Amino acid sequence: MAFKYPWEQRKLGELGTITTGNTPSTSITDYYSDDGIVWVTPTDICENITFESARKLSDLGQQVGRVVPKNTILVTCIASIGKNTMLGNTGSFNQQINGLTPNENKYDPYFLLTESALWSAKMKGSAAAGTMQIVNRTEFSELKTWLPSLIEQQAIGAFFKQLDNLITLHQRKPL
């Protein structure tokens, strides 16, 4: 694929809204439900797109949790840096995760998801030394990424989405 336009460097905070997750009090059982929206923790991140989580927020829990829309890219920023996913539906997440809700008029969510591995590599390299690696919301917002035009983002995003779907299909195929 040849690119027609030059790529531009942008800070993640310029691409949309950055949200740090939170944990509604686990001592209030009414905040959680078997049929609520996903509430993602790093251990729930095992696919490129997340539709399920071990715990879900009830309607009441959604009033306390930080709820974001479908296509928000979730990036772990504490301890297990490098586990990234995109929400397949409206959801919420804990404080170990930052979410980027992209301005979809300018940025392709799946393209950004593919780029998120590069963000994680940068975060691992610059995370605070010590027993626990942490990249705070401000540092996350300041991370830079390279972006082609929206049309090219969409083409790249569609290519990788198709490739990821093919890989998933082959992984599920019995031997």
Regions found by a protein language model. Give the residues of each.
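Histone-fold recognition with a strong bias for associated Lys/Arg-rich disordered tails
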Residues: I28, S141-E142, K173
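Catalytic core of tubulin tyrosine ligase-like
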Residues: K122
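Non-catalytic DNA-recognition/assembly elements of restriction-modification systems
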Residues: M1-N22, E47
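A short beta-sheet element
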Residues: T41-T43, F51-A117
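Amphipathic alpha-helical segments with low aromatic content
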Residues: M1-E8, S149-L175
